[in-house]
A protein has these predicted regions:
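Non-catalytic, usually N-terminal nucleic-acid engagement modules in DNA/RNA processing proteins
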Residues: 1-55
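Catalytic cores of enzyme domains
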Residues: 42-208
């Protein structure tokens, strides 16, 4: 993206454009679940799977792949996302999409030399959402659904969430996914499947 600090490309080519690659719902889950990364027992299997794909594409197109797990310092994926899609902040500290709700994620970005500088003006313009999603939501059920009130609307109480997951009463969240996230009425058709949701919840609990 124009004006962003992007890494140098192979052979001294100019970094012209940044492509974001991600998932909607559980569209990528089957491919990941069947990969050796999911079964090898090593840490961070989804990050390693994403890196294998991103790095392969970077080699194919002569670009450089960037990942959310590269930091610190972290790449500004959320800022990039808001410039590419009509995303908005939500009370759950996640970006909400008007169609997909909270059920989307960026797996990597590809810095590419494929476009000429004159083609960048349209890509650099921020995407403006049509209307506020969460402020128009009746009652904001996401803020009431968490059993330990980990979300205040202004902050995420990580310690309270993690402690709950390590208790017997937290097993519903482990098995079905975050109750606050599932309470959001936007994008319900894209909710993560049970195995996908449990994978992320176990990964979170394992690091806290």
């Amino acid at each position: 993206m124009a004006g962003d600090a992007l890494p140098a490309l192979p052979d001294g080519q100019r970094a012209a454009v940044l492509w974001l690659a991600g998932q909607v719902g559980s569209a990528c889950w089957a491919a990941f679940a069947e990969s050796p990364f999911h079964r090898d027992g090593l840490p961070d299997p989804m990050d390693r799977w994403s890196k294998s794909i991103g790095d392969a594409l970077a080699r194919q197109f002569g670009g450089v792949a960037l990942f959310p797990s590269d930091g610190p310092p972290d790449h500004p994926f959320q800022d990039w996302g808001r410039r590419c899609e009509p995303l908005q902040a939500s009370p759950l500290m996640l970006q909400i999409h008007p169609e997909f709700g909270l059920w989307h994620a960026y797996r990597f970005a590809l810095v590419s030399p494929l476009l000429e500088p004159g083609d960048l003006s349209a890509l650099a313009a921020p995407v403006v959402p049509d209307a506020e999603i969460c402020s128009r939501c009746d009652g904001q059920p996401c803020l009431r659904a968490c059993p330990v009130q980990a979300f205040t609307g202004d902050a995420y109480r990580v310690e309270a969430c993690a402690a709950h997951l390590h208790q017997p009463q937290g097993q519903e969240c482990i098995g079905k996914g975050c109750q606050a996230r599932r309470a959001c009425p936007v994008g319900v058709d894209y909710r993560y499947g049970p195995e996908h949701a449990a994978f992320h919840m176990r990964a979170f609990a394992g690091k806290h």
